[in-house]
Each structure stands twice: as C-alpha cells, then as structure tokens.
Amino acid sequence: MAAVGPPQQQVRMAQQQVWAALEVALRVPCLYIIDAIFNSYYDSSQSRFCIGLQIFLRLLGIVVSSIVLILSQRSLFKFYMYSSAFLLAATSVLVNYYAALHIDFYGAYNTSAFGIELLPRKGPSLWMALIVLQLTFGIGYVTLLQIQSIYSQLMILNILVPIIGLITELPLHIRETVVLMSSLILIFNTVLVLAVKLKWFYYSTRYVYLLVRHMYRIYGLQLLMEDTWKRIRFPDILRVFWLTRITTQATVLMYILRMANETESFFISWDDFWDVICNLIISGCDSTLTVLGMSAVISSIAHYLGLGILAFIGSTEEDDRRLGFVAPVLFFILALQTGLSGLRPEERLIRLSRNMCLLLTAVLHFIHGMTDPVLMSLSASHVSSFHRHFPVLFVSACLFILPVLLSYVLWHHYALNTWLFAVTAFCVELCLKVIVSLTVYTLFMIDGYYNVLWEKLDDYVYFVRSTGNIIEFIFGVVMFGNGAYTMMFESGSKIRACMMCLHAYFNIYLQVKNGWKTFMNRRTAVKKINSLPEIKGSHLQEIDDVCAICYHEFTTSARITPCNHYFHALCLRKWLYIQDTCPMCHQKVYIEDEIKDNSNASNNNGFIAPNENPNPEEALREDAAGSDRELNEDDSTDCDDDAQRERNGGIQHTGAAAAAAEFNDDTD
C-alpha cells in the first residue's frame, strides 16, 4: 500500500477538524435548552398538578438534553438526522394546511393604470414557490430517513398532493380532506420509520450503558468524567455557547439602542457603548452554565497568554503550560464562593470586577513561577547573550510594575476593606518574590563574572531565599486571619471554609514543613562536614589533586572523608544535601569512634600523596584543632534543589487547588 502523502494528510486533517467543529456546534443547543430550563420561572399560584407537570417536563428536558450532550459522534449525527426529518415533516404539514385553507391566491389581481383587470400573475408564481418549497422538504425528508427510492417518490407525491388540489381549484371541504389525509400518511410514515429505528436506539442505549458501567468499575468516576469531558470537547462547547449567547445579546441591545435613539448611524456614543458592555458582562455570568462558559473563555485566553510568555522568555517546560487550567478553575471557584450568579445585577458587576482583580494577581504569580526557573538557569549557566536575558528581565520588571500600578489604582478609588487588603497583600508578596529572584540572579551573575570560586555564594543564596520564604509564610498567616475575619463577620459559606482549610494546609503547613526539612538537611550536612578533618596550608600542595565534584584545585582548604578522599567543604555540603555517601566510593561519610589503621587509604586518584603520613588522621586533627574556620551549624543559607522546585510553581505547591486556596479565602 502506498504511503499517504502530505496533501492527503492535510485534507484528512481538515475533514477531521470540520467534523469536530460540526460536532461541537450540534451539542451547543443542548446547553441552551438546559440554561433556559434553569432560568425559567413558574407561577406558584397554579394548582399542584400544573406545578408537578411543569417540574416533570423540566426534569425530562434536562435529562434528554444531557443524554444528547454526551452522545457519541455517530449517534449524535443520527439523532439530528431524525430530528431534522421530523421537523421537515411538521413544517411541510403546516405549509400545506396554511396554503390550502387560508390563502386566497385569486383575491389579488394586478391592476393597470387604466383600471383594467389583468390575468392573475401572483397566483402562479406562488404555486411555483410552494411546489419548490415542498419538493425541498420532501427530498430532505426522504434523504434524512434513508427511504427506498420507489417509496420515497410516493412520499414526495403525497406532500405535493395538497398543492395540486389548490392549483386545480378543488372545493374547500375536499381540500381539507386532502390536507388531512396527506398529513396522516406523512405522520404514519414517520412513526413507522422511527419504530423501525427503535431497535437500533435500544441496542445503542444498552451498549452505551454497559460501556459506561464497565469504565466506571475499572477506572472509577473521575477517569470516566475526564474521558467524557475530552470526548465531547466540553470546553469548546462552553466557549461556543457563551460567545454565541453574548453575540446575540449584543446584537439585540444594539438594535434596541438604535431604535430608541431613532438614528440610522451605525456607531453609538461612548456612554451607550459602556452600558452595553456592562449589560453583557452582567448577563454573561447570570447562571452556573454562563459562569462555566466564561471560565472556558478565560481558559483559552490564559492558555495562549501562557504560551506567548513561554515563547517570549524561551522556556520549554511542560509544567509551565498549566495556566490555561489554573486560571479558569480559580475563577469558577471564586464565582461559586461569592455566589456570583445569584447576586443582583449591580452587585454582580462589582463582585465580578473584584474577582477579576484577584484572578489577575493569581495569573501574575503563576507567570512569576514560569519566569523564575528561566532566570535562574540563565544566571547559573553564565549565558552572556543580551537577547536571552532581556525577555526574562523585561517580564520580571513587568511583574514588579503591574502589581504596584494595580495597588495604586485600587487604593485611589476604594476604601480599605478585607478584599482590598487581600489584593494588596498578594501584590506586595509578588513584588517581594520578584526582588528575591532578581537578587539571586544578580548573585549568580556576579559569581559567573569572576573565575574565582565564591565559597559563600551558597550561603548568600539560601539567606535571600529563606528571607523571601519567611515573608511569604507571614503573608500566608495574615491572609488566613483576614479570611477568618471575612468568614465570621462578612460573608461566611461552606466553600469559603473549605478554601481556608486548603489554604492552611498548602500555604502554611506544607511551607513550614518543607522549610524545616530543608533546614534540617542543611544542618545535618554541616554537622557531618564539621566532623571531618580539614586540610589547609602546606598539606594542600602535597595532595596535588582537584576536587572530584567541581574539578577545581584546592586553594584554601579541603575536607577529608573517612575513606581518605578530598573535597571542597562547600562541594561536599551540597552533595550531602542529596545523599550521605562519598561521591567516589559511596561509603558512609561519618567518623567512627575508633580510628582504623588502614595504610591502604587512597586519595582521589587512588594513591597516597608524596611525603604524606600513611596515617594522616592524627596530624590532620591537630591541624584542624587550631583552625578557627569551623562551619557553624546554622550558617548555611541555601535551599536544596528539591525544595526550590517546590517553590518555583508561581502560586506555590500542587496544582489549582493550592492556587485556589491561596486566593479564595479573601475575596470580600
């Protein structure tokens, strides 16, 4: 078989995209029906039977719409084929009834300028239009139901019989009988075809039910919902639903404004334009489905914003592409927490603007998490290209300036409250994060500029990052208190309580736990290094070797392990953050109570250095006893790589839950 060429692949991909777009478009009406049912009202003064009937019909509509929404592509197309055939049949019956019984084609004669009655020209033209219309309905009907050729011709003729009776000027009662018989035949045929297809519908429904039950038993409810979410392209459906709804409302509002102002100009004033925008925003989140649709639109915007920033700063990390997921989840949780869709229109607009400010700060925090690893990698790799450093520094500068501007604008227009305090705290926290990142970046760049080993660099970096983490922890505690005050005295809810618990776990408890773990790892490493003898002075020249970790010569001092291998104290300390074995022979790095008399001890190259004492332990301890350069237990100030990766997520910690927890407990 010949391989499929690129043009054929492009055609196939285009066809798949067309079918996918059509599938999404066919699922959107289900959301409109569900949204209309949820937003409808019933009169409580009616009888119980009427109220019960309305509730039953609404539940039935929701169930049927939900089933159609999750149908497979093939079943969805068949459902719309049969539905379209039914609508064509009903429309054809209505047209025949109205044309045959309610239109007098010969009542209107064209009159010339001299008052002479001419032949009826309107009647034949309407006959032809009706014949073409009914032929279109008939052909579409038999095509959608896939009726056999001979039988299909009879059905088309049955649809045209009332028009033929109208043309032949049959009496009115005969035309009524003809229309009735034609309608009954068409209805009977439709019911017969649907009854034949009922077997297929039963087996299809049973197959879907067994498949769903099988997937639920094997994979669980979560994976089943995720598979359905992706299979039906639910985010795309929500976007199309929300955008078409907003577009329709915008068209109606523009038409009403033009009619009210009695102007034919296409443009409207700025005041009217602002009123239209406010009304569209208010109506764009008036129900749970519309909030989901707005979340889907925000997801698309955030996704492409994240991709653009990643391309601009030159990052290729896959974990940084989660902005399109974190932003909509955070927005939806904020909307649920504040009861956005249930507020009055004026309050809804204010609440939405506040939620968007919180969402903006969350997005900026996430962007900082995308930028910080790139900034650190550029500084540590000693890349001197201006084109590589400028985009990251420019984004970092924007991340510092935008929170300042946002805080200034909000403080200029609003009085101090819990919501403004929370937004300001998040902005200040982001500015501190940027300062910490730029400070560490500067330290690494200074280290790369000089060729001499900077032994205290590790301590300085840890000191800067630890200071930033401590300040973040303080902000987390303050925000928890602010959220507790809001919940107790302003607007408490179950969702807010859950978010506060998540905030306390992710942004307070885990941060303390990880920071303490990092500190203890460093303290243990320092203890182990301090327990090792130090070589300095003339003994370094006798070693005549390099550090096996950094491959630099020993200029000031070196530490010797129990297995007689030499390393820089700083290099060995970094190694001990990861594991407590020797980098060369993988023996435990510790000092035993009894010194082993091992004359076979070797240095990094496996041989004893010239003029070296075969048993150097006592001499080395004597030299180390007078040394005043002992490493203190708490002077180490750089976090290890694992802890740093945990803090490089921008909004910190795991996924959207931590982001929502950090920004959700202070939304008032």
Curated annotation (Swiss-Prot):
* Residues recorded as bearing Phosphoserine in the entry: 636
Alphabetized, the UniProt keywords read: Acetylation, Endoplasmic reticulum, Membrane, Metal-binding, Phosphoprotein, Receptor, Transferase, Transmembrane, Transmembrane helix, Ubl conjugation, Ubl conjugation pathway, Zinc, Zinc-finger
Membrane topology according to the record: Multi-pass membrane protein
Q: What does the entry give for GO biological process?
A: positive regulation of ubiquitin-dependent protein catabolic process; protein destabilization; protein ubiquitination
* GO MF: transferase activity; zinc ion binding
Gene, per the UniProt record: Rnf139
User: Which InterPro entries does the entry link to?
Assistant: HRD1_E3_ubiq-ligases, TRC8_N_dom, Znf_RING, Znf_RING-CH, Znf_RING/FYVE/PHD
Principal localization reads endoplasmic reticulum
Q: How does it assemble?
A: Interacts with VHL. Interacts with MHC class I and HM13. Component of SCAP-SREBP complex composed of SREBF2, SCAP and RNF139; the complex hampers the interaction between SCAP and SEC24B, thereby reducing SREBF2 proteolytic processing. Interacts with SREBF2 (via C-terminal domain). Interacts with SCAP; the interaction inhibits the interaction of SCAP with SEC24B and hampering the ER to Golgi transport of the SCAP-SREBP complex. Interacts with SEC24B. Interacts with INSIG1 and INSIG2.
**What name is this protein filed under?**
E3 ubiquitin-protein ligase RNF139
Q: Where is this region: Disordered?
A: 602-668
Q: Which residues carry this modification: Phosphothreonine?
A: 637, 667
User: Which parts pass through the membrane?
Assistant: 51-71, 85-105, 125-145, 154-174, 178-198, 293-313, 323-343, 356-376, 390-410, 420-440, 470-490
Record function comment: E3-ubiquitin ligase; acts as a negative regulator of cell proliferation through mechanisms involving G2/M arrest and cell death. Required for MHC class I ubiquitination in cells expressing the cytomegalovirus protein US2 before dislocation from the endoplasmic reticulum (ER). Affects SREBP processing by hindering the SREBP-SCAP complex translocation from the ER to the Golgi, thereby reducing SREBF2 target gene expression. Involved in the sterol-accelerated degradation of HMGCR. This is achieved through binding to INSIG1 and/or INSIG2 at the ER membrane.
Gene3D superfamilies this protein is in? Zinc/RING finger domain, C3HC4 (zinc finger)
Modified sites of kind N-acetylalanine = 2
Q: What class of enzyme is it?
A: transferase
What does it catalyze?
S-ubiquitinyl-[E2 ubiquitin-conjugating enzyme]-L-cysteine + [acceptor protein]-L-lysine = [E2 ubiquitin-conjugating enzyme]-L-cysteine + N(6)-ubiquitinyl-[acceptor protein]-L-lysine
Query: EC no.?
Result: 2.3.2.27
First and last residues of each zinc finger (RING-type): 547-586
Source superkingdom? Eukaryota
User: Which stretches are tagged as biased composition: Basic and acidic residues?
Assistant: 618-630
Originating species: Mus musculus (Mouse)
Q: Which GO terms describe its cellular component?
A: endoplasmic reticulum; endoplasmic reticulum membrane
